[in-house]
Structures are given as C-alpha cells and as structure tokens.
Amino acid sequence: ANTEIVHGGATRHESEYNALQYLRGDIEAGLIDLVLIHDGARPLATAELFVAIAAGAQTHGGAIPTIALDPREMDTAREETIARVQTPQSFRATQLLQAYEKAAVSGFVGTDTAACMEAFFPDVNTVAVPGDIFNIKITYPQDLAIAELLIPVQ
C-alpha cells in the first residue's frame, strides 16, 4: 500500500479538515465511502476495533467506540448516559466532508469527529460500538509506561 502524508494543523479539528480536503476528489468521485479517523495518541487500537467501527458506520452512518463510565465517575444529577469516547471514529465520507466544510465556513471547531458531525448532521445515526479498555490515550509520560505493559496483553 502507498503511504501519503498530509500535513496536520494546529488543532485536531484542523488536521482532520486537512485530511478530508486531501481526500476531497476521491470522495466526490465516489471512490471513498467511509472515512475512519484515528489519532496517534491511541497506539493500542486493535484491528478488530477498526473493523467494528467501519461496519457500524457502513450500517448506521457513523460509529464511535465507547467505554461505559464507572458509576463513581458519573454525575448522578444528569439523566443521559455518559461514556468515554475513543478513536478511531468513522462516518460516511460525503457527509463528513460536508460537515467539515460547513464547520470551516461557520468557525466551528469540534472536540472530536463526532462533535462536528453532530453539529452539522444531527440526524446521522452514530452508533456506539464497544470500545477497548486497553485503547488508552497517551497523554502523559506515565501513560507510555502503562502502554508498554499492555502490549503483551494484546
């Protein structure tokens, strides 16, 4: 497979926009049905998670991996279900490109891919796919040490 590099932006949102602009021609030509967006901060995402996310987006329009919060972490005053959201996240390519273009025009900057889709395509059914507790985000130096311990588990 060929590897192509797209320069990122100052924010996650801008990096995703740049990638979608790079893919624009193929998306508009109907050569790309789905886009999966993943960040390098979660290096332990499994192939099975990517497959599940792609299948969920193909069937429903969008898919995000989630991990249920421990009840001790939840704000019991809120009625809606709250979960930790991970990457990769996947959506149908045409709508995702349109969402990011609308975001660029309006100045919207989403915290993740799903936030941008929800802002501009609230009717897209984004399904929650079971995430992976080992798909940790590397934010601090100690996270890297934990990830190194988890590699043999996978």
PLM region spans:
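Conserved strand-to-helix beginnings and helix N-cap segments that scaffold or border functional pockets
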Residues: 16-17, 47-50, 141
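Acidic metal-phosphate-binding loop of nucleotide-sugar-dependent transferases
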Residues: 12, 40-44
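Conserved core of the sugar-phosphate nucleotidyltransferase
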Residues: 44-129
